[in-house]
Amino acid sequence: MSEGFDILKPTEADIQKLLMAKVHLGASNCTTAMSKYVYKRRSDGVNVIDLNKTYEKIVLAARIIAAVDSPANVCAISGRNFGQRAILKFCNHIGGAFPIAGRFTPGAFTNQIQKAFQEPRLLVLTDPLVDHQAVREASYVNIPIISLCDVDAPLRYVDVVIPCNNKSPHAIGIVWWMLAREVLRLRGTLPRDAEWDVMPDLYFFRDPEEIKKEEEAAAAAKEAEDDTGYTTQWDDAALDADWSATGTGNFAAAPADGNWGATTGGDWAAAGGEEWTN
């Protein structure tokens, strides 16, 4: 990593997060422009990305984003499904940036007639290859571009490159999470000696089918709980009650006076005064 302030360098925990998310595993093909970010090439053909340079570019990109006067002038785009949840969380956490998750509407930066027209001052992408339409239109109107780039990504019109594995959902999520955290640190919202209370898992892609199954399972469990009458919710009065207290009545009192073994004065076997069989 280039010389600079030690406070801006990655910690051991940051490097471990990047390694666990497989941010360093690049594609097998490598362009000439991206070769300077490659640490080495493995025997299986995978290019290993230098994580120190990755974190250095994350800090540089965060400094550019923090320099924009209003977060609403920053536009985050992800045509790739793995990055759509990440950009939505990123835009929310940095204070209201404009996200475009999914298909980019052609002419959104150049055609002033349509409703989707936007004039951002900065563009942040997940993949310049997938979001090529946004890259081309941004070049027409001179919008600076920051992009997550794999070693096989085209760098034309891209101003700041964040070298990483942008094809893995965990790698994309952790890079966007670190970018948002660094922006908050540079703004002074988050102290550098404090842990961010937002977990990286919040930025990871989740399969809609998996979410649907979890919701159905939770609904079924709640329905079964309602049918049986079983509940785990107890109020404070019931929990604080003294269940060992004795009652106020005298349940051990002696029986009433009298000879219970004496014979009765009447003849219970006597026949009735009239014939019942008539």
From Swiss-Prot:
The UniProt entry, under SUPFAM superfamilies, shows: Ribosomal protein S2
Which Pfam families is this protein grouped with?
40S_SA_C, Ribosomal_S2
Q: In its keyword annotation, does this UniProt entry include Transferase? A: no
State a GO cellular component annotated for this protein.
cytosolic small ribosomal subunit
Q: Which GO terms describe its biological process?
A: cytoplasmic translation; ribosomal small subunit assembly
Is 4Fe-4S included in the keywords of this UniProt record?
no
| Annotated segments matching region Disordered | 216-235, 250-278
Lineage: superkingdom: Eukaryota
Q: What GO molecular-function term can you cite, just one?
A: structural constituent of ribosome
Database matches in PROSITE patterns = RIBOSOMAL_S2_1, RIBOSOMAL_S2_2
Predominant location category:
cytoplasm
Keyword annotations of the record: Cytoplasm, Ribonucleoprotein, Ribosomal protein
Q: Where in the cell is it found?
A: Cytoplasm
Comp. bias regions, Low complexity: 256-278
The entry describes its oligomerization and partners as: Component of the small ribosomal subunit. Mature ribosomes consist of a small (40S) and a large (60S) subunit. The 40S subunit contains about 33 different proteins and 1 molecule of RNA (18S). The 60S subunit contains about 49 different proteins and 3 molecules of RNA (25S, 5.8S and 5S). Interacts with ribosomal protein S21.
**Family indicated by similarity:** Belongs to the universal ribosomal protein uS2 family.
Role of this protein: Required for the assembly and/or stability of the 40S ribosomal subunit. Required for the processing of the 20S rRNA-precursor to mature 18S rRNA in a late step of the maturation of 40S ribosomal subunits.
HAMAP family for this protein: Ribosomal_S2_euk
Q: What protein name applies here?
A: Small ribosomal subunit protein uS2
